[in-house]
Amino acid sequence: MDILGALESGEKYRLEIPGLPSPIDLPYVEIPEGGKRLRIVSLNLVGLTGLNRDLGKLLAARIRSAIPDLSGVVFLTAVEKALMLCQAVAAELGIEAVAVAYNRVKPHMQADRRPTLQVGSSSVTSGSKFLALYERDINLLLSATRGVVVVDDVVSTGGTLLALNDLLEELAERHGRDPLQMRGIFCVAREGDPQALLPAPVFSLASLPQPVLL
């Protein structure tokens, strides 16, 4: 039985991931792209607690295999689609806190009195946007002595990952230290072929079809 059942209508793509008890039927969606429409398979994990838990266990095992010693390593993710997944991975690995890049500077960050960082980014599902770190995440990243692990839901063009790397480089420059090494990018799925040279190896559980421009 499909994990998501019949929660979403329309044509579906069946994603099978080794280790999951059942396949996931994901909807095809069309999003604006340069005056046309881009047809993609939508993997939206927001709100799916059980699926995030199960995928988190699988990704945690992949991380343990690739990086057996996680001491001095800080986990980083971007809101909002990958946040629950990253929290599930961290819980499985016994990681107490993860650094989060937000999609804009928010009021609680108190940017007029606390340190913040912001860079631009672009992704298939979110389009052009900003990514921002505030004091708590900055200090957590500065505590890393052996690099950073990025957790994401889907790696497509790589725009979000390049923006995360820009944040790490800006953070290092501002604090007069060498840039933090991105040790690996761990995701549920890769979508098509990356359009950019990514800053770290990508470890995925599955693959999604190439987006189609209509």
Predicted features along the sequence, with ranges:
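PRPP-dependent phosphoribosyltransferase catalytic core
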Residues: 1-14, 163-214
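Active-site-facing substrate-recognition patch
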Residues: 1-71
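Short glycine-rich phosphate-binding loop at a beta-alpha junction
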Residues: 69-80
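Structural motif
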Residues: 73-74, 147-149, 184
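Short, well-ordered alpha-helical microsegments
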Residues: 82-86, 193-194
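Short Gly/Thr/Asp-enriched flexible loops that form oxyanion-binding sites at enzyme active sites
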Residues: 84-93, 164-165
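Short, glycine/charge-rich flexible loops or terminal/linker lids adjacent to PRPP-binding catalytic cores
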Residues: 96-148
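Acidic, divalent-metal-coordinating active-site segment for phosphoryl/phosphodiester hydrolysis
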Residues: 152-164
